[in-house]
Amino acid sequence: MKYIVGARGSQLSVAQTNLVIAELKKAHPDTEYEIKTITTKGDTDSRPLFTIDQKGIFEKEIDRAVAQKEVDFAVHSLKDVPSELDDNLVLACIPKRETVNDVFISPDGSTLDSIKPGSVIGTSSLRRAVQVSRKRPDVTVKPIRGNIETRIKKASGENYDAIVLAKAGISRLGVDVKYTELSTDDFSPSPGQGAIAIVARADDSKTIEMLKKIEDPDSRLEIEAERALSDFVDSGCRFPVGAYAKSNGSEMTLTVTAFSVDGKQFLHVSKTGDKNNPKSLGQSAGEELREKGVNDLALNWREKVEEWNKT
């Protein structure tokens, strides 16, 4: 039996797809897998991500290939996958999640705390940008695009003194670079950060059963809580909300942070509940955020992004 696997052509996407295949081969040693790389809108549009008013820019073309039976299943970074898929597709598998932390990379070994005032920090994420500005208001934060290795090289160039990105990407690529891990207390991660999503056709029970061999139940439940929260407040690239769920026995704690554009205002919610009811936990955290005024922050962000788009 041979499966065709859809993925982006980026180094990270291919690397994490190969990691998935390696795990599948442990469970199904006689099965073959072939990667088919597919170009997405996110690969060809060089604008900062927060200015693109469209969800699924890194996965839509690949999932279309799944739906049209050009590939059997697709491997994505879960944070790039919209919570609502086409009716004929399903989030078939979430393998064990990597670390959710962000990291700070500077050529001279500086940390975020020690880097000199006036330094330029690059990031592709509004969420990271506002948290850098909140912790170090004396530095400049600029958008940065490109794959991970390109961004690391840019940190040594004329335009950037350091970058902030997800630790999971560095780990999966095996990049040899020194970094400082940032605490989730200071840098609340994106909902779904560090997780991989595998999408298949809803009616392809054989493929779904095969993929379930590498499913991690706790990772699935934690992701469901984070995405339920994200859906409730309608967060995304254009409105940064950090969310991190962690299981502990029969319980799960969901910690959420939302910021104003300038980082001076922030809302913080931490809720603990039954880990087997993650969507309820996410909605409960969302309701508390709403009571604390998250809708005002969201409007603040939408107005600012529209202003940026006009410049």
Curated annotation (Swiss-Prot):
EC number, as in UniProt: 2.5.1.61
GO molecular function, one term: hydroxymethylbilane synthase activity
A Pfam family of this chain: Porphobil_deam
SUPFAM superfamilies given in the database record: Periplasmic binding protein-like II, Porphobilinogen deaminase (hydroxymethylbilane synthase), C-terminal domain
Catalytic activity annotation: 4 porphobilinogen + H2O = hydroxymethylbilane + 4 NH4(+)
Region forming the signal peptide: none
List of residues that carry S-(dipyrrolylmethanemethyl)cysteine: 237
GO cellular component terms, A-Z: cytoplasm
Entries under InterPro entries matching the protein: HemC, Porphobilin_deaminase_N, Porphobilinogen_deaminase_C, Porphobilinogen_deaminase_C_sf
Cofactor annotation comment: Binds 1 dipyrromethane group covalently.
Cofactor: dipyrromethane
Keywords noted in UniProt: Porphyrin biosynthesis, Transferase
Entry's family note: Belongs to the HMBS family.
Miscellaneous remark of the record: The porphobilinogen subunits are added to the dipyrromethane group.
Protein function: Tetrapolymerization of the monopyrrole PBG into the hydroxymethylbilane pre-uroporphyrinogen in several discrete steps.
Name of the featured protein: Probable porphobilinogen deaminase
